[in-house]
Amino acid sequence: MGKFEQKERERISTFSFPTTGSQSSTSIKSLGSPLYGRFSSLSSTESQFDSSKQPHEYEKSFYFEESQGEALFNKLKTYSFPGDKDGVKTRRNSSICPRKPNAVSPLRVESNELSSHSHSRSLSHELTKPSGRRKSYHRKSHAISFSRSCKPNFIDGYDSNSSIGVNSRKTSLASSFLDKEYHSSPDTSYTHQMSPKNTIMNTNEQLRRNASGRFGSLKEFAEKNQINIEGKIFAHKVETGDILQPLIDLDIDNK
């Protein structure tokens, strides 16, 4: 072991935290223990409860010491020994668990004071601002332009180069569209018109199905449609083993 490495190990092993208030210093060993932080074990003097202190004073000093310990730990983790492996250095230099300031820590108290002060300033600024129409942040939509393929027929009757104003043009287009919808026949507008040829073909097909849909028995139906009904039971077909009128014996217990 080199002289420099031995000196560093002795310095780290004898290091201790500075005392804060009436509480004693904590050994560096508590840093490596899983109970380091807010769950670290207290000494005999720290475990004694002072009745003169309020609970929030204990909590405030507790979180203040914790934030100091975290700051010191972040400073110490930058140190490394020459014999350390790369994995140890990486874990030591990595951020373990970055946390936000606690609810009653001095950092949180100062941030709350600053935020409340800025909020009061912004509120006073809003009150002194002259009243008017609120600025809209909605995204503007573009007007829809009809293409050649989807342009309605009634638009063709108007000349785009005419001297009619934009508003009057819109009104005339809308009224023309409404008049056309009102005077148009509901049959031609909302029903699907089939050609006579398709109607005749569908009628002939339906007649053919009705003519060939009557069979003397289930066996004849199965033979014409090439269906195997052996060992199968069909509803309301006695020849297949179905019971047309099943009976329920209510006096089964009396027998």
From Swiss-Prot:
Keywords linked to the UniProt accession: Phosphoprotein
Domain of life: Eukaryota
Gene symbol of the encoding locus: ICS2
Lineage: Eukaryota, Fungi, Dikarya, Ascomycota, Saccharomycotina
Compositionally biased intervals (Basic and acidic residues): 1-12
Phenotype on disruption: Increases sensitivity to copper.
Feature: compositional bias, Polar residues: 13-30
UniProt region (Disordered), positions on chain: 1-32, 82-142
Location of Phosphoserine modifications: S217
Protein name stated in the entry: Increased copper sensitivity protein 2
Biased composition, class Basic residues, residue ranges: 131-142
